[in-house]
Amino acid sequence: MEKLWGGRFQGKSEAWIDDFGASISFDQKMAKEDLAGSLAHVAMLSKCGIIPASEAAEITAGLKILQEKLALGELEFSTVNEDIHLNIEKLLHEEIGPVAGKLHTARSRNDQVATDMHLYLKQAVAEIIQSLKHLRVVLVQKAEANVETIMPGYTHLQHAQPISFAHHLLAYFGMFTRDLERLEESVKRIDISPLGSAALAGTTFPIDRAYSAELLGFSAIYENSLDGVSDRDFIIEFLSNSSILMMHLSRFCEELILWTSHEFQFVELTDAFSTGSSIMPQKKNPDMAELIRGKTGRVYGNLFGMLTVLKGLPLAYNKDLQEDKEGMFDTLETVQTSLDIFAGMIETMKINTEIMEESTQKDFSNATELADYLAKKGVPFREAHEIVGKLVLECTQNGIYLQDVALSHYQEINPLIDDDIYVVLSSKTAVQKRNSYGGTGFDQIKVALENAKKTL
């Protein structure tokens, strides 16, 4: 089949080489955007008097037929035509004849593909933003139901201080809020039209780039045509933001994987988000959480791949940029699905509140409470720290915990200790009293929840 750019060539191409150079297997995802861009472009050509209105009407009608066929799944693409742009132009030619050739006036595939990608990413990011907003709602609802659920707080994966489970959930709420802000703020750099930049230097035709941008719903146009077709920083920014978002999902998934284990038993995931073993009948595996954790590396890889593709490219377009799409498509799908799966896991998981709280009674996470107690009695904190550290060592040697130590022994250690120490050492008291702003105290959590709700 004759190629649309074949005038300069004499030799015939070979199918296996065509297959290597073709991108239609993946860039056909942008068929909708490519047709939308062409409709805006032909409208602009007509408005500016570059092509007659009658021909513009023919082209427009043909493009709308292709839109209908696309919606019905009736468009067939070929690797002979390389990419989505040439495939659609060929299909348009089959619909309306030679006038289809006028569509490409004052346009290059360089600005055409950049336009498609801006349109595609803009819509897809909007959908991710909605899913992220839903996840934040789920976290707030789960936190609101668990304000007084006590759990161990960890450092180094060792019991550190008791906290409210709601406090833990709201920590992730803060992280996902920043993820949301990053994505929302990045939209203004996606929402820019490169259409009309042509190959790299603009065009000799009297086009109206602002008009085509307006038709496509863009809020701005690239001020420099070379910039418009050369860079993919808007994709890199999305991949970077996605990597941070997936990192947050992965960290929480790691905790869910630990918490569902027999050693923790803090939470139980519903059957829908779990799988079994082909040999061990008792197994209930947190596969969805593990997959999100695993897919995080995949998203990182897409970011590094894109950075590597671009790092040595001179301006303007180079065929290397064909490699800018699959990583973007894959990341969009991965992030979208991961968010939806994760929200479902959090929304439906069972919290074993008694086991969570009991675990805070079988450790020394209340040691800080004893040190603070002594400090409030006038003992310098460093001295109090030393006293409590030695007592913890003594307790571990005797197989008991701080709440098991007799009052008489406490008073031997320091006569300032009174019988109110046992209230101080309770997990609930330890949590309740941490009422500094942003702390885990119940009153502070209620404030945090109200503040969070205002941002939903």
Swiss-Prot record:
It is found in: Cytoplasm. One of its GO terms (cellular component) is cytosol. It catalyses: 2-(N(omega)-L-arginino)succinate = fumarate + L-arginine. One of its GO terms (biological process) is arginine biosynthetic process via ornithine. GO terms for molecular function: argininosuccinate lyase activity. Its main location: cytoplasm. Keywords: Amino-acid biosynthesis, Arginine biosynthesis, Cytoplasm, Lyase. Pathway: Amino-acid biosynthesis; L-arginine biosynthesis; L-arginine from L-ornithine and carbamoyl phosphate: step 3/3. Belongs to the lyase 1 family. Argininosuccinate lyase subfamily. This is Argininosuccinate lyase. It comes from Listeria monocytogenes serotype 4b (strain CLIP80459).
